[in-house]
Swiss-Prot record:
Family label: Belongs to the non-disulfide-bridged peptide (NDBP) superfamily. Short antimicrobial peptide (group 4) family.
First-listed, main subcellular location of the protein, grouped into a coarse class: secreted
Any one GO BP annotation for this protein: defense response to bacterium
Domain comment in the entry: Amphipathic and cationic peptide with an alpha-helical structure.
Its biological purpose: Amphipathic peptide that shows no antibacterial activity even at 50 uM but shows a low hemolytic activity against human erythrocytes.
Secretion signal, residue range per the UniProt entry: 1-23
Keywords: Amidation, Antibiotic, Antimicrobial, Cleavage on pair of basic residues, Cytolysis, Membrane, Secreted, Signal, Target cell membrane, Target membrane
PTM sites of type Leucine amide: 36
Protein name (Swiss-Prot/TrEMBL): Amphipathic peptide CT1
Residue ranges the record assigns to the propeptide: 40-68
Subcellular location: Secreted; Target cell membrane
Expression by tissue: Expressed by the venom gland.
Length: 68
């Protein structure tokens, strides 16, 4: 009877260890695949639309007035 309880406890602990490490490893694998996959690389350029390379004279005047 004692042996069965010990085996049951060890089995439950082992199953918890496997399930938690599976979720942890899945998170790492998903992160790496997002970095290396086409979708992950495509999303790196999401802030390029915010940059405007041309600054007009009105923009410079506004910035100078703002910094006073």
């Amino acid at each position: 009877m004692k042996t069965q309880i010990v085996i049951l406890i060890v089995a439950v602990l082992f199953l918890q260890l496997v399930s938690q490490s599976d979720a942890f490893l899945k998170g790492i694998i998903d992160t790496v695949s997002n970095w290396l996959g086409k979708r992950g690389l495509k999303n790196l350029d999401q802030y390029n639309d915010l940059f405007d390379g041309e600054i007009s004279d009105a923009d410079i005047k506004f910035l100078k007035d703002l910094m006073r």
